[in-house]
Amino acid sequence: MSCVNIRGCCIGEGRPKVIIPIVEPTETAVLEKAAEFSTLRADCVEWRIDCFEGAKDLPTIVHCAAKLRVALKDKLLLFTFRTKAEGGKAALAHEEYLHFIRTVLATDCADLIDIEFFTVGAELPALIEDAHTAGAAVVCSSHDFHKTPPRAELVSRMVAMQQAGANLPKLAVMPQSRADVLELLAATAEMADRHPETPIITMSMGALGAVSRLSGEALGSAMTFANPGQASAPGQVSLDIVNEVLDALHL
């Protein structure tokens, strides 16, 4: 698997890199969490802007982003607006979403930016190129909170993300059975073995899928989300346990 190197952090090499989310509603609370998270054992902080009271107030987001970048010190910063259609807290029209992405990129604060695969559609390659021009790596994401598609579909979706130029294809799906968890893990291993051009991020959500958040080094998922006190998705494991298990399973 190839490596994405950001600020000296090699995503796709060795132990999966740990992401912790900020889901606070106000600028003051966001910055307080950032100061706290800057000292924790995690590689990357995700700002879930859809959870922010000013989620559609772009000048406020730009102002807060600059302060957040400073507060996090050397942590990687991932910007995410998770739309309601993909399980988030707020909705954006198509053009609003594109404008949001480009506004965040213009801040020069993003180490990584989440771009939703289905939300952007045909404009994905151009938007990814914009991100790369701005110096940001792209997490291209797809979420299914109802089911786990077949393995072949999961793989083809991640390959399409790669072909569009994404640095880190990401899939999060909901299992309805143990077989669904295995389907996601098999798709992850197949991608890592047969399409190693980029690292990938995968997870099976909920308690049933929690094992997928901890087995990335062995099976091919390069990053995992951990809960530092408040989860941003079903099945996130606490940060302390994630670190303990990743250490125990380190190859």
Task: Give the positions of each predicted feature.
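Catalytic alpha/beta core domains of metabolic enzymes, predominantly
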Residues: 112, 117-251
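Glycine-/acidic-rich phosphate or pyrophosphate-binding loops and their flanking alpha/beta elements
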Residues: 6-7
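Active-site beta->alpha loop and helix N-cap motifs at the rims of alpha/beta catalytic domains
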Residues: 2-3, 13-133, 143-147
